[in-house]
Amino acid sequence: MAETIVMIHGMWGGSWYWGNYKKFFEGKGYRCIIPTLRFHDMDPKAVPNPALGATSLLDYAGDLEEEIRRLDSQAIIMGHSMGGLLAQILGSRGLAKALVLLTPASPGGINALKPSVIKSFASVLSGYGFWKKPNRQTFNEAVYSMLRLLPLEEQREIYDRFVYESGRAASELGFWFLDAKGASKVDEKKVSCPVLVIAGSKDNITPASVVRKVADKYGAVSTYKEFPNHAHWVIGEPDWQEIADYVSVWLNQALTGSGH
């Protein structure tokens, strides 16, 4: 039976942005399942559901857990950006055969508020009550934080597909130290499967220095790989295939038990 990969998108995104990876990994014989997070299946130009603003990371994780538990076998869970944090939460619930974290957001306990990260969220953070409202980056922020290595035309195309994100989820991520519920916390002792953590040296929103700490958190089960010519949009930047190839080789080794 083919191995299953569940691919979890990040902030402002949707299942659409996994197109390259879906085609690549289906070509390797994997079955790919690409959920869309709650309230993200919307017209980018439409007014977002007001309930989005108060949606927690744990709401997203709960929805994903339900979907994953319906599968007939344990899946590989792959997440990009905020999806990488959701993958870690799901991994700590014993739901993953392996975790692949692509430029992941960091769990509570790791300080991610570097100057470039704050700049990435400047317009969001400047609005009063941002922690309970739907939010969206400006085009310039999206380019600076995520899309800077793409051609202008592609930057526009991707930005125009971005939807609103939950202010609560963003706050649980960035300001975990103010969150009494600890929504972004992950108990690393409960993650026993192999973990691959990918960083881009040019990433502004999940800087490599922070992503390395994510890998360190999982100790012996984790593998850290940093790509010097990549930033945040590793699923679609020029030469994205080199990262997908690396992931594919690592998965082969991790799943056959020949080391990771």
Task: Put a short name on every predicted segment.
Residues 10-13, 201:
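Active-site glycine-rich loops that stabilize anionic/oxyanionic intermediates
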Residues 26-48:
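Conserved alpha/beta-hydrolase
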Residues 59-75:
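Conserved acidic catalytic loop of the alpha/beta-hydrolase fold
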Residues 79-83, 87:
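Gly/Ala-rich beta-loop-alpha elbow adjacent to hydrolase catalytic centers
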Residues 95-132, 169-177:
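Flexible "cap/lid" loop of the alpha/beta hydrolase fold
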Residues 191, 197-199, 203:
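Short beta-strand/loop motif that positions the catalytic acidic residue
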Residues 204-210:
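Conserved alpha/beta-hydrolase "acid-adjacent" motif
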Residues 221-260:
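Catalytic active-site module of serine/aspartate enzymes centered on a nucleophile-bearing elbow/loop
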